[in-house]
């Protein structure tokens, strides 16, 4: 009787543990684009842990995506014994000293945030990733170009970078390339016709504005790609990079720039897509986006007040 009771008790413990594990993640579904089927979250993480560079392409305003990003970090940490680096689009190169000082305990969190220009949603969406990396003693890379320089490029073109003083030039990738390729076609498609927006302009002026905005996008990608490749080069670290999905979808943008600098690196690309209904989520039409598509349950929109 005691044996039967012990077996039953063990069975219940296993069941409850499995339920607790499943409930630890927000509602989601993971689509493996190579296998062409939905898979378990842990199966995805196990594969990502074998890569050299992992890109987590997000929609910046989706809270469930950010929770799952932290879960990816936790899952990789359980499986990878070698060096791991967290890199973020959300911090810019010129605040790397403040990031390092906070990780080392030389700055309080309040001092760190005052000095590092975090995004407004940092406390709710990115803090958990940084704090996890800090607890694991992982380096955190502020990999993006300072916004003020990207704005100058958007106004004046790449010539704006040439005029930067030597010390400031180091905050931007050394090699800059902005080809009219598939990434340009995607970007132009998203931007659309700018002639009908804001200040009236001629078609030529609108085309110039779109091109210079694209140049600013390329400078961001080049700078983040250089930061990622440099971090990987140190001791062969696995680099996990969080960025807006446009920067990594279809392995373009930042992925392409990092690959150019680290041609032998194994790269895993994840794209998080919020949807209204997980049951009808279909990964097949979007299977070229990356290695995995993680569908999250989009937050319900609040009804407008009458």
Where are these regions (language model features)?
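Acidic/histidine-rich, surface-exposed loop or edge segments in extracytoplasmic proteins
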Residues: 26-29, 49-59, 108-114
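Short internal beta-strands
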Residues: 84-91, 268-272
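C-terminal regions of proteins
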Residues: 223-234, 246-306
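A substrate-binding/cap region within the structured catalytic cores of diverse enzymes
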Residues: 97-231
């Amino acid at each position: 009787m005691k044996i039967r009771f012990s077996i039953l008790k063990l069975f219940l413990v296993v069941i409850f543990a499995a339920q607790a594990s499943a409930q630890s993640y927000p509602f989601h579904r993971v689509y493996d684009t190579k296998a062409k089927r939905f898979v378990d979250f842990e199966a995805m993480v196990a594969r990502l842990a074998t890569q050299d560079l992992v890109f987590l392409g997000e929609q910046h305003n989706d809270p469930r995506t950010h929770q799952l990003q932290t879960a990816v970090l936790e899952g990789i940490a359980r499986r990878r014994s070698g060096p791991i680096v967290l890199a973020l689009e959300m911090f810019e190169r010129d605040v790397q000293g403040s990031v390092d000082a906070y990780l080392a305990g030389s700055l309080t969190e309040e001092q760190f945030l005052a000095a590092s220009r975090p995004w407004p949603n940092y406390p709710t969406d990115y803090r958990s990733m940084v704090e996890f990396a800090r607890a694991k003693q992982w380096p955190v890379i502020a990999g993006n170009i300072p916004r003020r320089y990207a704005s100058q490029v958007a106004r004046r073109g790449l010539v704006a970078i040439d005029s930067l003083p030597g010390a400031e030039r180091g905050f931007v990738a050394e090699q800059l390339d902005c080809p009219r390729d598939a990434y340009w076609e995607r970007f132009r498609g998203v931007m659309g016709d700018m002639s009908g927006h804001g200040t009236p302009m001629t078609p030529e002026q609108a085309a110039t504005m779109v091109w210079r905005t694209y140049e600013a996008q390329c400078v961001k990608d080049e700078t983040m790609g250089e930061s990622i490749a440099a971090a990987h080069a140190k001791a062969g670290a696995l680099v996990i990079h969080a960025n807006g999905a446009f920067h990594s979808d279809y392995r373009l943008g930042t992925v392409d720039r990092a690959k150019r600098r680290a041609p032998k690196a194994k790269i895993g690309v994840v794209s998080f897509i919020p949807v209204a209904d997980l049951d009808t989520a279909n990964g097949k039409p979007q299977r070229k986006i990356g290695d995995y598509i993680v569908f999250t349950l989009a937050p319900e929109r609040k009804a407008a007040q009458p």
